[in-house]
Swiss-Prot record:
TM region positions: none
Catalytic activity: 2 D-sedoheptulose 7-phosphate = D-glycero-alpha-D-manno-heptose 7-phosphate + D-glycero-beta-D-manno-heptose 7-phosphate
Protein name as annotated: Phosphoheptose isomerase
PROSITE patterns xrefs: SIS
Amino acid sequence: MYQQQILIELQEAQQVLNDFINDQHNLKLIQEAALLITDSFKNGGKILSCGNGGSHCDAMHFAEELTGRYRENRPGYPAIAISDPSHLSCVSNDFGYEYVFSRYVEAIGQKGDILFCLSTSGNSKNVINAIIAAKAKGMKIIAMTGKDGGKIAELADIEIRVPHFRYADRIQEIHIKVIHILMMLIEFEMAK
C-alpha cells in the first residue's frame, strides 16, 4: 500500500546524508566543534543549547547526553538546554518570544562557555539574539543550520550546515546524526 512511498522517503534521506558526507569540509567542522567543546569543558566551561520546535528537542537531546551519557559510563559534562517552561513563558510574555534564549544567556553565560544552537532556516530571530548575547559574554558559537545557513552562518564561530532546501525534517535528521558523532568524539577526547 505505502511501500513505494516508504522507499522514496528512505532514499531521499539517504541522498541528503550522502550529499552531506561528500563535502569533506563538514567532517572537518564536526571535528573542530568537538574539540572546541572539550576544550571548554577542560577549562571549566559549559554548553548552553537552544533551538525551536524539533531543533529545540535536539538541543535538549544534546544536553541530556552530555549530562547523562551517550555510549560510555563517565562523569557528566556541564550542559543546559534552554528549555525551562517557566523561563520560556515568562520571557515570552514579558519581553517577546524572540528573547527567550538571549535572556537566559545573559543570565548564566560566561566567557569560555559555548552556545550550541540549531536552526534549520538559519534565520530564527530568538536564536540570532542568543548568539548576539553570547558573543557579548565572550562565548563561542557552534551553529547547526540548513538551507543556505541564513543570517546565523555569518555569526557562528563554527557552522555545520545541511544544504537541503525542501524539508526541515531532512535537515534535522542530519543534525541528530551530527550530535551523536559529536558525543562520540567528546567522549573519546575527554577520556584522554
